[in-house]
Amino acid sequence: MFSCDMASRWRELHGSGHWDGLLDPLDVDLRRCLITYGEMIMATYEAFIGEHRSPNAGMCRYRHADLFRRVDVSHPGWYAATRYIYATANADVHGKVLLRPLCREGRATECNWMGYVAVATDEGAAALGRRDIVVAWRGTQRALEWVADLKLAPASAAGILGPEGADGTDPSVHRGYLSLYTSEDQCSELNKQSARMQVLTEIARLMDKYKDEETSITVIGHSLGATLATLNAADIAANSYNTSSLSPSGETRAPVTAVVFGSPRTGDRGFRDAFHRLRDLRMLRVRNRPDRIPHYPPVGYADVGVELLIDTRLSPFLRRHGSESQSHDLECHLHGVAGWHGDHRGFELVVDRDVALVNKFDDCLADEYPVPVRWKVHHNKSMVKGPDGRWVLQDHEPDDDDDDDDDD
């Protein structure tokens, strides 16, 4: 999937020119770049333990050191996960978007694993043309019900917008998304720090570590994760976390780019305007035309960033009359990015991406293709037969950082 040109063009592909001339027709290197980041988001879905009966429900299956070797990404050696992100929220939000294990002894009863921070390895930095720091936010593959349920009043975004939030306009964002981003729980072993501070602390550490290298910060997400990525990217740029504290006068500022798929609206016009004024910040928002979630909330909120509009209904590989979940499915978005040529140019896969992937977690592929629906199932649902002949659930690899949300 990689092109040598992607390394030399990375600033252009990350929005230095606001993607002018790259979207119609869709640049082939940009297609590959978007799919690479989409796979890194997909890793959060593959690794999440969603079985309510598991005491590990809401956690990540894998140790962060092994994450990219255990999930389906094209270049597992290019990035290393350095920190996992855990989020909690207030009571109005918690039960609507966070998973609670049925087991009272579960570790994630009040919070969930929401993604990770990763950094390009030496191998990856050589291939990518710089040291890329990635923040990946997990979302939800569910269709409309979750976003329609979150009917909460807006809240001030001044706290995450720094000086841009103190200009008297009082920009606002969705209270539910802000709660997930900023809530902490001193009684939780995983969430004594908010998701926000977990990420910002790790980015500051990595920016100091790689202060002598060319760096970039890429914040990615799908669905609910896209809204968190939007808040996080604005926060990083507004509060200068894209500089090293060890650099004199913060003279070196890493570009911050948000890449999001199927994103609901995050804030009002004031937030949009403040976002667009941040000089180091860019955002590319991939929207699938039949997906209704990007139109929510329908009143009082504004779209942010540059939009790449695709329409997966033109794909001959997918069901002609797909469900709402199909139009919102992340793998379907990546399929669209691989083959979209515009409304009047047909659909042809420019990037050779396996069409079987669209059935990984959904029923999207046309019946003529012999691919089972929702085929991504862990062997025996992670039940393992022990030497005594009894079956036990083994769905979680203990990680040294599980209870270490204050380090570094």
From Swiss-Prot:
Primary enzyme class: hydrolase
One record GO biological process: lipid catabolic process
Keyword annotations from UniProtKB, A to Z: Cytoplasm, Hydrolase, Lipid degradation, Lipid metabolism
Record region (Disordered): 386-408
Positions of the catalytic residues: 223 (acyl-ester intermediate), 223 (charge relay system), 291 (charge relay system), 328 (charge relay system)
Subcellular localization, as worded in the UniProt entry: Cytoplasm
Transmembrane segments: none
Record's GO cellular component terms: cytoplasm
Cysteines paired by S-S bonds: none
Entry coiled-coil feature ranges: none
SUPFAM superfamilies associated with the record: alpha/beta-Hydrolases
Molecular function GO labels: phospholipase A1 activity
Annotated InterPro entries: AB_hydrolase_fold, Fungal_lipase-type, PLA
Enzyme Commission code: 3.1.1.-
Bias (Acidic residues): 397-408
Highest taxon, organism lineage: Eukaryota
Sequence similarity: Belongs to the AB hydrolase superfamily. Lipase family.
Record function comment: Acylhydrolase that catalyzes the hydrolysis of phospholipids at the sn-1 position.
Protein name: Phospholipase A1-II 2
Gene source species: Oryza sativa subsp. japonica (Rice)
